[in-house]
């Protein structure tokens, strides 16, 4: 049973990795690099920008990400060639901004922008609307995910909003055992009193 659970978990993680790799070729993505997000814990969330803007492939010069008030803390990690800032509005929403200090991220290069965060207190799926600027051109990653195409939105979305799943906080076994102990009712083998 333990082996089956391990095999299922490994297969699921592998498929998720393949899905992320496929998505990274076209859209702004969020990566956790093998570490799940747990409610009310700290972790690292990485925004990946896989290309520039428009048919001319302009370099990315500015990135702006919005985090709702559910997020408890967020601080961009240092990225060479970029300066970052965080502004918190009165309603608790955070705006993370990265500005290129040079020519920006070329169209042919992939850029990672890691953020140290304290995950929201409640488990759930959280959107992180993100705007990618290439000079005056904008790629606005904020389209909602819908089950199928409808009159207002195509499927899949042209500019899907990056989002992350936050799991319920993991419970740990107590460090010291107290109280009553279970009694084994398994038959004993061998001589009387043996506990093989």
Label for each model-derived stretch:
Residues 1-11:
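Bacterial N-terminal signal peptides that target proteins for export
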Residues 68-95, 162-168:
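A surface/secretory-pathway sequence property marking extracellular, secreted
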Residues 10-19:
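Bacterial N-terminal signal peptides
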Residues 27-33, 39, 135-196:
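Extracytoplasmic/periplasmic copper-protein system
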Residues 22-26:
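Sec/Tat signal peptide C-region and signal peptidase I cleavage site
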């Amino acid at each position: 049973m333990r082996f089956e659970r391990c095999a299922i978990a490994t297969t699921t993680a592998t498929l998720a990795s393949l899905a992320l790799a496929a998505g990274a070729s076209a859209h702004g993505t969020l990566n956790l690099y093998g570490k799940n997000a747990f409610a009310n814990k700290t972790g690292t969330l990485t925004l990946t920008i896989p290309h520039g803007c428009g048919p001319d492939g302009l370099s990315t010069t500015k990135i702006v990400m919005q985090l709702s008030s559910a997020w408890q803390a967020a601080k961009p990690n240092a990225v060479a060639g970029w300066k970052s800032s965080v502004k918190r509005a009165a309603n608790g929403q955070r705006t993370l901004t990265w500005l290129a200090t040079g020519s920006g991220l070329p169209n042919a290069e992939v850029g990672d922008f890691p953020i140290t965060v304290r995950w929201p207190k409640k488990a759930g799926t959280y959107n992180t609307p993100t705007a990618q600027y290439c000079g005056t051109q904008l790629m606005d990653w904020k389209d909602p995910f819908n089950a199928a195409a409808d009159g207002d939105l195509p499927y899949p979305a042209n500019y899907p909003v990056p989002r992350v799943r936050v799991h319920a906080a993991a419970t740990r076994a107590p460090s010291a055992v107290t109280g009553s102990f279970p009694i084994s009712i398994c038959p004993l083998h061998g001589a009387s009193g043996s506990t093989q």
